[in-house]
């Protein structure tokens, strides 16, 4: 385990020599065209060019940031990732979204949902969010009359305007120095008490492009080789590897040869959901840097392996940076050359096309011609399947992070007619996660089945039937729960509730990361077999980290590099608060406590 002074010396040496390498560890994958779940072949990472940034900060911060920037390979044109700069806006963004808006249409019954779904399919509209109360849709202003003309009279006047000028919001969210302003009634950062800059880590000040994420992952592997590996879990259509952290450390003397109980956390299934990618990275950073300092986190990494995949859709994520900020699918070719891409969360093999997947490749929810038609889902499934067959992993938990709408969804997604056999456990943990989030930042997340849209009761049978604007079959959630028997499987839709949608401002990265990291700790507590009865919520409700006091649960790069006071570090490890509550009027819940 690196001591802070060791890390400082090593990274200073790195800075002056310009050399950092990390050899990917773990098992490789088969060629994506392989039709069978067979043995894997190793796959390596391509090298990245590294460039040094000019100093512009104080001496210690400059040294810290320069080391990181040199290792990550951030060129001068990309300094706006940490400090917004005057890069020109791609003209394609303006031409594509110049007249677009986002409408919220209220729905009241299954008939209205079905009518709206048909109109969306006819006009090839982009559904941003849908639930039992409303549907958020992106469309051009000139298409609004056509949409309303296809809807029943009951839906003619139930819409409200969420985003009036989408192209402007895209521009301001990517280039905040050019005048990005929060809505006056914005609630996305309320009750947090801090901004991303408080973390002191350059990486989480803003969203990061894929090459930077990859270099950052290599950096952490080189710093913490005792419990961190860099592995590949799949291959994309364009030939990129899908990188992941594998975290875990067996206690000394442990000779157990049983498969390691494993939790998998993924983000970025949909390319435009940048907050999901940043949140997976934040969770990984906390687990990695707290190992050996936080006894509960150390136990979690000793008892379980953790697979964290910032994005399972690197092709789409790169495209959302370079060409189209709101791109959703992967970049795989389809039967229509002008409509590429498959929706990765409709492409998994369990109950594929459960409720009539949109068959047109131009649909944002297009699931391909058959199950596992996408390169990414097929190769990830092969990797996960082989992990279980080779007795390397026993998947016990799965978190699939998305945005937006602040929901915690449990199986099944494809239908409400099938009740999951572990429903009681799923609901118990889901409500525990929701409570942890509420006590972290006072944000409310709704717990529900992933199948639920507008739920009605079928006459005669009494069965609950759900009607959705989007198809819900072929989800990663259902596949990991049913096929790999990951007992605690959830899809978590992150911030916000529609004010910004997929264009969530970057100052929400750290608050969102903290509340989901706390959720992971609750998940870990359940996996240790203690359920909800042992949770001590007092740690969340102001014990040592009330408003105005710095939360010590996040070890920043500043501390890793420059804090040489070992006694203070040991003391902070003993006295550490594992959850942050940063509002004076926190909930004073009784009963459970965490750890």
UniProtKB/Swiss-Prot annotation:
N-terminal signal peptide: 1-22
Segments forming a coiled coil: none
UniProt binding sites for Zn(2+): 270, 273, 402
Molecular functions per Gene Ontology: zinc ion binding
Keywords: Cell wall biogenesis/degradation, Disulfide bond, Glycoprotein, Metal-binding, Secreted, Signal, Vacuole, Zinc
Major subcellular site: other
Annotated Pfam families: Peptidase_M14
Cofactor: Zn(2+)
Binding site for substrate: 270-273, 328, 345-346, 403-404
Entry's Gene Ontology cellular component terms: extracellular region; vacuole
Disulfide cysteine pairs (residue numbers): 339-362
Domain Peptidase M14, first and last residues per copy: 206-527
Cofactor-binding details, from the entry: Binds 1 zinc ion per subunit.
Glycosylation, residue list: 386
InterPro entries (alphabetical): M14A-like_propep, Peptidase_M14
Compartments, as annotated in UniProt: Vacuole; Secreted
Propeptide residues, chain positions: 23-178
Statement: the UniProt record of this protein carries the keyword Ribosomal protein: no
GO biological-process terms attached to the record: cell wall organization; proteolysis
Known function: Inactive carboxypeptidase that may play a role in cell wall organization and biogenesis.
Similarity comment: family membership: Belongs to the peptidase M14 family.
UniProt-recorded name of the protein: Inactive metallocarboxypeptidase ecm14
